[in-house]
Amino acid sequence: MFNKIDKEIINLLYCNGEISSDEIASKLDISKGTVRNRLIKLKDEGIIKNYSIRARWQKMGMAEAIVGLEIAPENYIQATKDIASYDWVNELYRVSGDHSAIAIVVSDNDTIQDKVADLLKVKGVKNVYPSFVQDLIK
């Protein structure tokens, strides 16, 4: 069962993916063994999918776009599989609200708009709503 300690562990990891189990134990005043056991449980239950970084693409001469996608319901499953197969799509989310999916697209500055346009070529994608990231605030 997911509890307060699990939430605190996840919050610490979210803020600093490099934090050690020792540091987590110290900050939460729990044993290292408890931290290790909780992390194993959170991974086994699929709550923690992986550990990753948040890159500042602009500092590397790259561009990042957050793209809202309007996808026809009858094509949704295949369209999202096709979109997820692109190596320049870093993340893809099924969402509710104004869009049916959100894609995080990363490419060099010269081709980012072409990559966004390529999403419109996927069968079932009716429209794209790109927002180009200027800077990471948090």
Residue ranges, per PLM feature:
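A compositional/biophysical signature of low hydrophobicity enriched in polar/charged and small residues
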Residues: 1-138
